[in-house]
Amino acid sequence: MAATEIIIERTPQARPAAMTGATKPTLIGQTREEMGEMLREIGVADKQVRMRVAQLWNWIYVRGVSDFDQMTNVAKDMREKLKAHFTIARPEIVEEQVSNDGTRKWLLRYPPRGAGRPVEVECVYIPEEGRGTLCVSSQVGCTLTCTFCHTGTQKLVRNLTAEEVLSQLLLARDRLGDFPDRDAPVGAMVPNEGRKITNMVMMGMGEPLYNFEEVKKALLIASDGDGLSLSKRRITLSTSGVVPEIYRTGDEIGVMLAISLHAVRDELRDLLVPINKKYPLKDLIEACRNYPGLSNARRITFEYVMLKDVNDSLEDAKGLIQLLKGIPSKINLIPFNPWPGTNYQCSDWDQIMKFADFINSAGYASPIRTPRGRDILAACGQLKSESERMRKTERLAYEAMMIVGHGEDD
């Protein structure tokens, strides 16, 4: 096997552009209406507000600037007023890692916002043929305690704000040269033509539907046609099954849906994904059947981690087909990623192939996720912030296998 090549960049502990603006309100993550009200509060005349909001929206989300002084068509006195009252700074980059397969991972630090100390989250970029996918976090930590997932062993610290969700996308586009007049980074692979980030998945740290309002606001801004302009068919929200908010996601956001399923019987899913005790399979599947716009072109993705002698029998495969009957679906099979202290093992490869063949023969797409970014510890079920993570020499990182292939091509 070829030697692994990893680039690690550590930023200084104090980054003035990120940290000094942290005490000011941010314009990132605000709706147009909220941004307009913020401008009125600093004395912008009503007759100018709509024009100023349009200017700011374009500079922040189309041009990707993070400094008011770069807004060259905004009068200097207005730029000074904006600088005095607001920020559009990016979060602090604690660490950036680049895998030899092009996978990139950023450890980002945000201000406390009531958490008592600064908090850290990770986001991951996966380049593929003709597309690039960004995996975004929605919470610091997680409440779900799924027994096979190492990320779930980190206690929930707090929800991320809409600005903090969006800033992961903005920062990644900065680092990838994905805004106009920006150069792509030298070295690891990124798509040569078109946008570097074509797809976005809410599959990082946390349960996004336990932070519904902020995630909703962030995704509606990310898909706004006059800004970041990501197609809703290229945004996937992954949930462990918060049923009431699945209905709201379809009605109020309209992005693609992925379900962390992992079992076809309530008694087993109660163990693997404890939220099932509150929202059992019957209710979850009913919500999926009623998700708006389902078709062969807009399928729900069901994630299924392969656990040896737990959920990998052909009887489980038959149960999976029966459970999803009539739902336009894609079933992602994920080889389990062992981590120190877990009692689970990955299914044997032959068994995974038999399981996949059975699913495929029933007419369902059933890709087996292959590891990406394992050399930079960026893989499925392993995202964990620096203060809570295991020693790197002990960690097996495979989160990225879960990320790739989500969303539909327009």
UniProtKB/Swiss-Prot annotation:
Record CDD domains: Radical_SAM
Residues the record lists as binding S-adenosyl-L-methionine: 206-207, 238, 260-262, 337
Domain of life according to the entry: Bacteria
Listed SUPFAM superfamilies: Radical SAM enzymes (SSF102114)
Role of this protein: Specifically methylates position 2 of adenine 2503 in 23S rRNA and position 2 of adenine 37 in tRNAs. m2A2503 modification seems to play a crucial role in the proofreading step occurring at the peptidyl transferase center and thus would serve to optimize ribosomal fidelity.
UniProt cross-references to NCBIfam families, sorted A to Z: rRNA_mod_RlmN
Subcellular location(s) of the protein: Cytoplasm
Name of protein: Dual-specificity RNA methyltransferase RlmN
Reactions catalysed according to its record: adenosine(2503) in 23S rRNA + 2 reduced [2Fe-2S]-[ferredoxin] + 2 S-adenosyl-L-methionine = 2-methyladenosine(2503) in 23S rRNA + 5'-deoxyadenosine + L-methionine + 2 oxidized [2Fe-2S]-[ferredoxin] + S-adenosyl-L-homocysteine; adenosine(37) in tRNA + 2 reduced [2Fe-2S]-[ferredoxin] + 2 S-adenosyl-L-methionine = 2-methyladenosine(37) in tRNA + 5'-deoxyadenosine + L-methionine + 2 oxidized [2Fe-2S]-[ferredoxin] + S-adenosyl-L-homocysteine
Gene encoding the protein: rlmN
Disulfide bonds listed in the record: 135-380
Top EC class for this record: transferase
Note: Reaction proceeds by a ping-pong mechanism involving intermediate methylation of a conserved cysteine residue.
GO biological process, any: rRNA base methylation
Catalytic-site annotation from UniProt: 122, 380
Pfam families according to UniProt: Radical_SAM, RlmN_N
Chief location bin: cytoplasm
GO CC terms: cytoplasm
Keywords, in A-Z order: 4Fe-4S, Cytoplasm, Disulfide bond, Iron, Iron-sulfur, Metal-binding, Methyltransferase, rRNA processing, S-adenosyl-L-methionine, Transferase, tRNA processing
A GO term for molecular function: metal ion binding
EC number(s) stated in the UniProt entry for this protein: 2.1.1.192
The keyword Phosphoprotein is annotated on this UniProt entry: no
Domain Radical SAM core residues, every copy: 128-377
The record's free-text note on cofactor binding: Binds 1 [4Fe-4S] cluster. The cluster is coordinated with 3 cysteines and an exchangeable S-adenosyl-L-methionine.
Record Gene3D superfamilies: 1.10.150.530, Aldolase class I (3.20.20.70)
Family: Belongs to the radical SAM superfamily. RlmN family.
